[in-house]
Amino acid sequence: MPRPLDRRDFLVMSSAAFAAQWGFAGPAAANTMTTPVIDRLSVKVLTDSSYDTPRASASKWVKVRRLGLSAAGDYRKTLHNEWGLALALESQAGTESRNLLLDFGYTTDALVNNLEIMSVDLAKVQGLILSHGHFDHYGGLIGLLQRYRSRLPGELTLYAGGEDNFCRRVIAGSAPGQFAEWGVLDRRELAGAKVRLVLCPDPTVIADQAFTTGVIERRSFERVFPNTFVDYSMKDGIGCDIPAAAEKAGGKPVPDQHLNEHATCYQLKDRGLVVISSCGHSGIVNATRQAMKVAGIDKVHAILGGFHLFPADEDYLRQTVVELRAINPDVLIPMHCSGPGLAAALRNQMPDQFVPSTNGTEYVFGV
């Protein structure tokens, strides 16, 4: 039986070598697809890790609409915020509009409450996207389907980055070798709700207007910060089917590298790319450069979502800002797991691009 791998084994191995040895597909070649072009994009923040009192944010590139302290017409209803992320995306190309839900937060109750307050019409949703296999991004999904499947279109597809989105996740316990459950997405429940599953390890166009990066190539200084561990086994029909990884892990949980994490992107007419990195375990610079590579476009208009920099020290944040300044996006909107350190650094060093985010905000690009 192979020996269990520790985190050092993962850090000394290149992402490409690790992916090959563990049975994962590598990043796609450059310019493998023609990316669609849109005229307008609305991003509604349905679930985020913080909520602040509404305050104005000025940017010539994006219209920012902040929700008040309570729902319109009923002061008793207010937003619920929690650790996690869920976004409603509405894009428009010409006269055609498309509506997608990207990630689903930690709990169904918060997601459903905020969907209602932010006036998201489930009947118009044309697709679902899951960024990666962490519970705080899919926790609200099954409950949403159980409660409101009849409101959603009959033909509904969930686009996930790859097979490892369905692996069982665990977290380290109080004693060495002990682990506690941290969720697993059961594809049987998706099938029971008549949701078609499409895995997207390669770049994929979604609903004619969005596209995903596919597997994110890891070429920058960035590293995956310690997070969950992965159990690659199948138990009672639940889990992920990656035989090479299961064999190599030897039945032991191994540090999570999120090799099937992907970002959701749009190409905005005359502006450039909008890159949405829901959690950014792969690195926000890596994710953005992968989007640029897939689309064959150097101009990035906006980067938003989770950057997963709350564990980062000052040197790491400083290097991240250097790389972001080199990419030179017009707008930067860190959310969820990005951390107060990054927000402070961007406010200080990229004040014209930085837009602070809070739960219940709508961002409109292309106006």
Predicted regions and their residues:
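N-terminal secretory signal peptides and thylakoid transit peptides that target proteins
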Residues: 1-18
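Active-site-proximal loop/helix segment associated with metal-binding centers of metalloenzymes
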Residues: 180, 205-266
